[in-house]
A protein has these predicted regions:
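Beta-hairpin "wing" of winged helix-turn-helix
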Residues: 29-30, 34, 61-71, 77-78
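A short alpha-helical element within helix-turn-helix/winged-helix DNA-binding domains
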Residues: 35-46, 60
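Residue cluster at the C-terminal edge of the helix-turn-helix DNA-binding motif
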Residues: 45, 62-64, 104, 121
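Interdomain hinge/lid region at the active-site interface
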Residues: 95
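Short, cationic-aromatic polyanion-contact patches
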Residues: 14, 38, 72-88
């Protein structure tokens, strides 16, 4: 698993890690059922604190992207289903993104084309 963290970013490391794992699942780089590195191993590989990785894994688990078993470690969930909470979160986040897009002068067609292009690169999602 290739993870690139920006230590100068205002985005916390645990959020960057969480986001990169989600995108890797979406792109198909991480497959459903695939094991993730242990917290210790990933922390060592990235040069970060184990608590940072643990926090990312905890968020991913609570969001349903991964499951964690004491004996077998963390793995990508084989069934990913959206809940009502996720749809509400998505609505809020899309409202913000669309507002920013419009305020920055990007036309709807250009935005939709960008979305289509990105969506087409996501080999790990069932569409």
């Amino acid at each position: 698993m290739i993870v690139k963290l920006n230590f100068d970013s205002e985005i916390p490391i645990y959020v960057q890690l969480r986001n990169q794992i989600v995108v890797s699942i979406g792109k198909g780089d991480l497959k459903q059922g695939e094991k993730l590195p242990t917290v210790r191993q990933l922390a060592e590989d990235l040069g970060i604190n184990t608590m940072t990785v643990n926090k990312s894994y905890g968020i991913l688990k609570s969001e349903g992207f991964i499951s964690i078993d004491r004996r077998h470690g963390a793995k990508i969930n084989s069934t990913l289903t959206p809940g009502i909470d996720f749809k509400e979160k998505l609505d809020d986040e899309l409202s913000l993104v669309i507002s920013e897009v419009g305020l920055k002068g990007i036309e709807k067609k250009e935005f939709m084309d960008m979305c289509e292009k990105i969506f087409s690169t996501m080999k790990g999602i069932k569409a």
